[in-house]
C-alpha cells in the first residue's frame, strides 16, 4: 500500500473519532468575552489537553494571567525542523434569533457539523491534529507543536505572556495558522496579510433617566441623535470613506501585482454577495471589491443602544446611549496612532462623548514567496486538488503579530473554512469535505517540511 493509500485509509478510519471529538468540543460554550463562562473556558482547556494526550502527544496548560494557552505535540529531535500549528478554541457569542438550533448542541447532519465554533476554529484545529498524527505514525523527521489559544476572540490580551514562558512554549522554525476563510468552495486561499483592528464604545449621558418627549422634546438633548451625528462625521455611509483627519496618512496602497493576484484568485462578486446574503454592495467592480475587503482600512458601526427597543414606539428622550464601532487597519497603520486621531476628533465634535477602547490589534503582512510558501502550495493541491490563491485576509488575528514579534520566523496560513460556513454568524457549521481535505493537506505539509529539513 502506498503512502497516499495509507493516508486515505487513515482518514476514513478516523472519521468517527473526529466527529466525536468535534461534538464534545462544540458543546462547551467557550465564549471568552462572557465572564459568566469562565468555568467553561477552563473545561475547554482541560478537554484540549485530553484530546492532545489521547492522540499520543504530550500536552500542558500554560497559564497566562487570563485564560490559558494549551501547548502540546511531538518531538523527534532537536536536529529536525519544528513547526507550530496555531488555532483558537474560544468562540463568539451565539445569541442571534436566526439560529435554527441550540448553538451549543452539536448536530452531525450527514457530514455537516453544526454548532458555534465548528468552523471557527475547533474543526480546523482537529483536522490539523489528525493530519499531524498520521505524519507521526510515518516517523517523519519533524517536530510538530500545537498552540491552542482561548482568547483570540477578545484580541489575545494575554497571549504574549504565554509565549514568554519559553520552557513550555519553545520557539519553532515556522508557524502555520489555520483560522482563515477561503474565497469559495473548491478554491483554497492562502492569506499573506491581515488587517489590524481597533474596537471602541462611544458613550454619552445627557440625563439621569429617560424623559417624555412630548413634555421635554425640543429642549432636551437627545444622546442617540448626537451619537449618530458623531458617526456621520466619522464615515460616509454611502461610500465608506473615513472622514477622521489623518486616518489615511500612513496607508500604503496594494501594488498592481497584488491586485492582479487578487483577481487571479477566482473571486466573484456575485458569489461573494450570495455567500454573505447581501442584496447590494457599494461597488460591483471585482478589483475594487477585493481592494476594499482585503487591503483598505474601514470604519464600521456595529450597534447603537439606549432608549426604547420594544414593540411599537415609546415616546421618550433617552437619558443616555452607546455607539459600538470598530476600525480595520492595513499594514503601515498603527492602532495607537489611529486611535489617538479618532479620540481627538470625537472630542472636537462633541466633548461630552466618552471614547472607551475595546482592544487593538496590529495589521500583519508576510510574504507569498519562498520555500515555506511552496510547501503550502503543494500541500493544498494534495489535499484539495488545487493550488491556493494568494490574497490578504480582511479579518484580524492578534496572535499572529505577537508570534511574529516574539519568534521572527515565517508565518504561513492554511485555512479550511468556507464563506458559507458562517464565521461569527448564526447557524455556523463545518463539513467533512473540508475536514478530510484538511487532514490530507496537513499530512502532506508536514512531509514537505520534513523533506526540506532544518533551515
Residue ranges and their predicted role:
Residues 80-148, 437:
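Active-site metal-coordination/substrate-binding segment of hydrolases
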Residues 121-193, 454:
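Acidic/histidine-rich catalytic neighborhood of metal-dependent amide-processing enzymes
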Amino acid at each position: 500500500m502506498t503512502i497516499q493509500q495509507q493516508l486515505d485509509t487513515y482518514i476514513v478510519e478516523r472519521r468517527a473519532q473526529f466527529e466525536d471529538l468535534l461534538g464534545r468540543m462544540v458543546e462547551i460554550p467557550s465564549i471568552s468575552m462572557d465572564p459568566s463562562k469562565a468555568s467553561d473556558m477552563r473545561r475547554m482547556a482541560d478537554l484540549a489537553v485530553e484530546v492532545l494526550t489521547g492522540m499520543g502527544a504530550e500536552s500542558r496548560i500554560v497559564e497566562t494571567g487570563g485564560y490559558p494557552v494549551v501547548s502540546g505535540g511531538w518531538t523527534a529531535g532537536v536536529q529536525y525542523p519544528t513547526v507550530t500549528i496555531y488555532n483558537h478554541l474560544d468562540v463568539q457569542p451565539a445569541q442571534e434569533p436566526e439560529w435554527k438550533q441550540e448553538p451549543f448542541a452539536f448536530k452531525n447532519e450527514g457530514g455537516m457539523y453544526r454548532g458555534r465554533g465548528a468552523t471557527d476554529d475547533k474543526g480546523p484545529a482537529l483536522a490539523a491534529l489528525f493530519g499531524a498524527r498520521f505524519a507521526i505514525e510515518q516517523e517523519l523527521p519533524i517536530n510538530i507543536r500545537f498552540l491552542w489559544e482561548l482568547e483570540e476572540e477578545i484580541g489575545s490580551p494575554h497571549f504574549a505572556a504565554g509565549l514568554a514562558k519559553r520552557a513550555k512554549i519553545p520557539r519553532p522554525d515556522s508557524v502555520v495558522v489555520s483560522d482563515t476563510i477561503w474565497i469559495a468552495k473548491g478554491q483554497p486561499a492562502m492569506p499573506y496579510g491581515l488587517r489590524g483592528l481597533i474596537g471602541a464604545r462611544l458613550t454619552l449621558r445627557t440625563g439621569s433617566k429617560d424623559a417624555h418627549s412630548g413634555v421635554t422634546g425640543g429642549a432636551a438633548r437627545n444622546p442617540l441623535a448626537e451619537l449618530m451625528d458623531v458617526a456621520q462625521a466619522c464615515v460616509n455611509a454611502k461610500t465608506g470613506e473615513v472622514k477622521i483627519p489623518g486616518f489615511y496618512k500612513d496607508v500604503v496602497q496594494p501594488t498592481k501585482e497584488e491586485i492582479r493576484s487578487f483577481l487571479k484568485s477566482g473571486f466573484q462578486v456575485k458569489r461573494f454577495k450570495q455567500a454573505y446574503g447581501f442584496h447590494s454592495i457599494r461597488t460591483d467592480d471585482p478589483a475594487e471589491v477585493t481592494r476594499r475587503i482585503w487591503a483598505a482600512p474601514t470604519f464600521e458601526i456595529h450597534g447603537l443602544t439606549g432608549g426604547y427597543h420594544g414593540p411599537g414606539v415609546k415616546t421618550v428622550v433617552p437619558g443616555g446611549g452607546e455607539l459600538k464601532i470598530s476600525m480595520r487597519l492595513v499594514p503601515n497603520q498603527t492602532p495607537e496612532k489611529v486611535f489617538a486621531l479618532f479620540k481627538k476628533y470625537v472630542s472636537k465634535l462633541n466633548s461630552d462623548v466618552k471614547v472607551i477602547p475595546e482592544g487593538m490589534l496590529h495589521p500583519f503582512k508576510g510574504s507569498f514567496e519562498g520555500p515555506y510558501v511552496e510547501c503550502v502550495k503543494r500541500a493544498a493541491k494534495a489535499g484539495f486538488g488545487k493550488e491556493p490563491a494568494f490574497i490578504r485576509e480582511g479579518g484580524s488575528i492578534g496572535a499572529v503579530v505577537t508570534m511574529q514579534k516574539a519568534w521572527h520566523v515565517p508565518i504561513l496560513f492554511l485555512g479550511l473554512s468556507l464563506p458559507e460556513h458562517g464565521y461569527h454568524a448564526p447557524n455556523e457549521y463545518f463539513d467533512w469535505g473540508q475536514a478530510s481535505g484538511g487532514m490530507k493537506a496537513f499530512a502532506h505539509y508536514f512531509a514537505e517540511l520534513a523533506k526540506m529539513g532544518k533551515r
